[in-house]
Amino acid sequence: MSKLYPVGVQNFEGLIHDGYVYVDKTAQIYELFNTNKYYFLSRPRRFGKSLLLSTLEAYAQGKKELFKGLALEKLEKDWTVYPVLHLDLNTQKYDTPESLTNVLEENVQNWEVLYGASSSEIGVARRFQGIIRRACEQTGRRVVILIDEYDKPMLQAIGNEALQNEYRGTLKAFYGALKSMDGCIRFALLTGVTKFGKVSVFSDLNNLRDISMIDQYAEICGISEKEIYTYFEEDIHELAAATGMSYEEACAELKTNYDGYHFTENAIGMYNPFSLLNTFANRRFGSYWFETGTPTYLVELLKLHHYPIEELEHIVTSQPVLDSIDTASTDPIPVIYQSGYLTIKGYNKMFENYTLGFPNREVEQGFFKFLLPNYASVSVSKSPYQIQCFVEEVMAGKVDDFFERLKTMFADIPYELARDREVHYQNILYIIFKLMGFYVQVEYRTNRGRIDLVLQTQDYVYIMEFRLNGSADEALAQIREKGYAAPFAKDSRTVYKIGVNFSDELRNIQEVKVEMGQ
């Protein structure tokens, strides 16, 4: 029988009963459960948070038989059974105040069937408090509380301040029950993609320990390289055979595509479990994580604040910025980081700041592919084909065709989108050349309204200078004066020097001048 991969499987009991492969995280779960009381964990979507909570639920319910052969079987001696209240906010679309209230109401009603209700308790927050108290009194055990995707309503309301404030008030009151019923609670873990700051839903929970950037728990979600070789050695060989690669090439391709998530400055890289398991199950590489959820709200933030896309490549920031999201802020970076599209690439101990970057090729390529139709004049369906054409044209030396196609990318861009013209035109060019860079060599630099670009293929070298509201002749003169072509003086390839002027008035390329030779 072939191995069963738990793609999308979030229930631990079902996973074990049905014989799916399970990467053992139970030693860390034991430590988590027995060293503190209140926790918060932020991780990207599809990273194993729901399975973590389900495993904790089975542990808290004393289901020893499920942990046979796992680390927890030997670590736990008592297997005490606790009452568990498990709230999953990931199942609903949140677009009205009632959306959230209805989900909370449904869960509270289900718990009241188990532990009773009181007519004196008005509102879901008060009823939640009563449920915690009665569960503790009736069982003689303190309660375990697990909340999955606590922030889903807040995330879906980004851009709608009134609705977000409504959700914040509802959730703050609901989660406030954890503090007021402290004596009845054994353990609580809240998970989500993001952590909202300022007037937070957590502001009353000053004893909540955030383990999102703690080395001790950096590997509690996701799959490490060591775990890949422990649990999936045979699968790598089968993947290599199916894709015509050597074992070493398959390992390198897995690392390039799916590794690279760092949640602290010292942590090892973690692989995206959803993409990794899909790759093994399908015996082919793909953009599995990216295709299950597009970052629409992130793109809206970038566009709303006219954010220069190139800056995503070299962000330096501090832990307080990464730790929480202020909905009034114009900085989209905390949301992009916490959502898993950026990760920690380096740490400066002296200044206590972090360098961020894209974790891997799947995320980087997927992100820029998604950006293109949101910035340029091209449909979602035609976007991949346009990049293919750009690449084929530069590989064939078709300079005129390349720039005619480039002009179409700027055509018919609404005035609102192009309001900050310089940033917008730089963003479009950067996205296009970034996507081309996955197939040909591209070096891209910006400086005071100018863009310098060197693009290399097997047969051609293109040295381009882009100007805004200048002239193509000035751009070409800059290439000559700065000696940009000098490194290619002895190169056998055909070298093109190209000056390009972008007109603010036309909102498009106005003029292109081409010169051949070093």
Positions of the model-derived regions?
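Mg2+/Mn2+-dependent nuclease catalytic core
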Residues: 164-169, 468-485
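Conserved catalytic cores of phosphodiester-cleaving nucleases, focusing on short active-site segments
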Residues: 429, 451-468, 482
